[in-house]
């Protein structure tokens, strides 16, 4: 029993009931009330979505250019063959990918056990049927197997373009998860006089490439690793960044007199408090035409001079006028 009412109970009893190499029930108790559902749901989601596994990602079949083909002498079409290949359970030791070869001819069943394997690759369901050959049938293919996590579609998976890749290689959607099924139940538990506690029971079934008990341990490590950051949570002070005004083109800081306009045009601009080229380019044609004594001819003169410098009327300038700019 805990020493204080403020301390949380931790599970002290863990039982593993193994039904087969691929299925087991793991029960843990006691948990404080509510923790059974909290942890059970988190572990279940991690087990289903975040466990590493192996899956075929690419298949190249001799004489086949696309998945909607058929092959003489083979009972199944290519789509069915690819679906059957996805059902093969691979396990790689010490490597993250491998290229496998399958060659067979003559009447009979082609199964996963017919694939040629290096010493560090296993097929856990060698009796899994890939296709059936007729008397004159033959099949030759290469299968690429990779390590990954969760489910990855071809469009969502970044496929490395290899110039040496065999023509006609077909990309496969890949389900890497080694977990076939997982569910959990929360049952009542009791410690001394307390009867409001939880018992968590996880029912896990895998494809055989990982032990159910090891799967729970891996999921727990992932959860701990993800949550550990919150244990050391510290606010990061936000530094106040002084906004710097964008640099101003030196041409804009020059007085309008430098444009060498006619005296009439220059005087009209100064009468409207337009002293710098930066002041001028922010005015529109309509605004300038409202200026007393400044007509269309003067406006065209101003536009031509500005255009020669790569400037136009109606421009917008940020932080204008700059600090410290005075009338000339």
UniProtKB/Swiss-Prot annotation:
It comes from the Bacteria. Signal peptide: none annotated. It catalyses: RNA(n) + a ribonucleoside 5'-triphosphate = RNA(n+1) + diphosphate. Residues 1-234 are annotated as: Alpha N-terminal domain (alpha-NTD). Pfam families: RNA_pol_A_bac (PF01000), RNA_pol_A_CTD (PF03118), RNA_pol_L (PF01193). GO terms for cellular component: cytoplasm; DNA-directed RNA polymerase complex. One of its GO terms (molecular function) is DNA binding. One of its GO terms (biological process) is DNA-templated transcription. DNA-dependent RNA polymerase catalyzes the transcription of DNA into RNA using the four ribonucleoside triphosphates as substrates. Homodimer. The RNAP catalytic core consists of 2 alpha, 1 beta, 1 beta' and 1 omega subunit. When a sigma factor is associated with the core the holoenzyme is formed, which can initiate transcription. The N-terminal domain is essential for RNAP assembly and basal transcription, whereas the C-terminal domain is involved in interaction with transcriptional regulators and with upstream promoter elements. This is DNA-directed RNA polymerase subunit alpha.
